[in-house]
Amino acid sequence: MKELDRLLDRIIQRVNINLRELAYDVSPLVQKLIPFNQMTKFYAFYGITPHHPLNLQFRNSNLAGSYFLGKCSVTNSLLYKSDIRGDELKQKADTFKYQEYEIPLDEDEEIEIEDSFLIKTLVHNFSHDPETLEKFFIKDTISTHYANIHGSPSNGCFLGPFSTVDLTTIRDCLAGTFSYIQAGEVSHLNIEPGTVWVRVPDTFNFMYRFPLQRLSNYIYFTAGNSPQGIFIDFVEDRKEAFQRVFNVVNLEPSVSVPSSASLDRFAVIKPKTHISENVLVSQRAYLQNAWLGKGANAQEQSYIINSRLEGNDITAHGAKIIEADLGKDVFVGFNCFLRGRPESRLTIGKESIIMPHTIVDIHKPLSIPAGHLVWGLIADEKELESNSMPLKDFAKIDTRFSKGNMVFEGSGAEFVTAFKGRIRHILEANGAFFNGHSNKGHAQQNQNISFNTIQPYPQGEKEGLFPTIIIRP
């Protein structure tokens, strides 16, 4: 495994060079975070469909347990159980609109991963940077457990566990544990753990910071240790269910799936689960006694347990919904943790927006009214009051406003409009509005994927490295 050692040292050095202005050394956090014997045990796999351009290139890298779809190149990198999902990449002749510009693409977009270490990380969407529309790059970057790199080119960064960088070009930055950044473009920043930051320059700025002592019950990460807390325990308790999914070659769906819906081969479906028309269930999703109404979706690393989603509900990447009832058109953002109890269920009214990285963890029944914006850390009615607002009231904000640990500046109307527009786009992209003839999306186009596996050198100096592989039509 000497080559894996050299490769990790190379990646650590390159990231440290990029972070030198922040005086940050990633080595104590990363060394031995994933034992190398784990990185030799798992195959990688890729999907082929008639809808997505195929061009995969792997050089001098480990890809253990990782999944690839669409155009992607990986060079001098370590990818452990990560999902590189290129089904939303822009294609040749597409036009990208940015401010007053309409920019045509000369070639298909490609995800380009170089000198990076991604651990159980999701890479999805497409580059929103007008300077690099055809290259969704991830370079000199280390991303730890259950982070999301969503439409966010990254160079010289460290992403803590359960962090999300969303629609943001990020350079030479630290994204702290459980932080969420959607800010357009950032560089040379140390973003503290538990920060939720949504910004459109000159339009609005939403900022919330979790109380770190309480957040540490859910997730904390220190040098020399693996991530720990309720989030990790929750996932680890259900890990065995995924082992069967990945060990069996041919696995028939255990539930009825309508012809307009898509159930990924690598999702876990437990008994008493119902899937309606136009539903999308992505790889590594986990459903148990879950009722998904028409147009609902469960994205990567999401968990829906003993819960009912009435329809057109979005469960974003990494979100967890337990013992809850959601009305129609509810958005649950990245890495949310919504947990009711069997005798104390959580109810969320229709058309509500649960901000990314929101924690609702209750021991008494709690009802969130329809049309509300919710954020922060909520354990009871009192905390719901200080961490939520009706969307119609939030839209009236036109200056600085604060409530609890949340501070907002700018136009509330623009904020609400932007969120609603994005929710509409997600539903469209996922095929929620398919009518039998038009408006196809992932739920319809991801139904027929053929999967192929690739494996690393089994022993010798190159043990754990995958050979150079180029896969083209």
Residues covered by each model-derived region:
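Short, conserved secondary-structure segments in the cores of folded domains
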Residues: 70, 109, 251-253, 265, ...
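Beta-propeller domains
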Residues: 258-289, 293-295, 299-300
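Extracellular beta-rich repeat passengers
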Residues: 40-42, 46-64, 68-69, 73-78, ...
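Extended low-complexity, polyampholyte segments enriched in Ser/Thr/Pro and acidic residues
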Residues: 1-10, 14-17, 27-50
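Transmembrane alpha-helical segments and their membrane-interface loop/helix boundaries
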Residues: 464, 472-473
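Eukaryote-specific, low-hydrophobicity, charge-rich regions
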Residues: 44, 52-58, 237, 241-263, ...
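Glycine-rich hexapeptide-repeat left-handed beta-helix
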Residues: 11-28, 83-138, 145, 149-154, ...
